Amino acid sequence: MEFDVVVEIPKGQRNKYEVDHKTGRIRLDRLLFTSTQYPADYGFIENTLGEDGDPLDALVLLQEPTFPGCLIRCRAVGMFRMTDEKGGDDKVLCVPATDPRMEHIRDIHHVAEFDRLEIQHFFEVYKDLEPGKSVEGANWVGRVEAEAEIVASIERFQETEHHDEEH
């Protein structure tokens, strides 16, 4: 299964950028309150709607960071299931679909344990100093569950889009 990820935040950034879905422009939302940096390029899967009402979040493992607004053709290898102050906030872990350096990564257990721990640690602590924000439970699941969530998020998006057209 392949899909497009729109990068909002490149790896190594503390700036939290978000795409304004009405204008398509990129807005600086805030600087992270903690001294942590994004451990991978971070953005969302196009034409999806996650449980939190936003597009489904995605991280892309790359050799080099890209830039806000970059579109990457990806495939899922796993997902970090987490809950924040607004509810379910899953993060799909992806690799570029056509990168031969990532060909061997097919499922979550193919991602180095340290890389998984680094990503997990980031999401467990990145909101720690922000008033009113929190991260609750979190765990890794494999590619099959990630792809099922992508399909469910596409269906949510299509239902919402169809519902909006009727009203």
Q: Where do the PLM segments sit?
A:
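Hydrophobic N-terminal alpha-helices or hydrophobic patches in metabolic proteins across all domains
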Residues: M1-H167
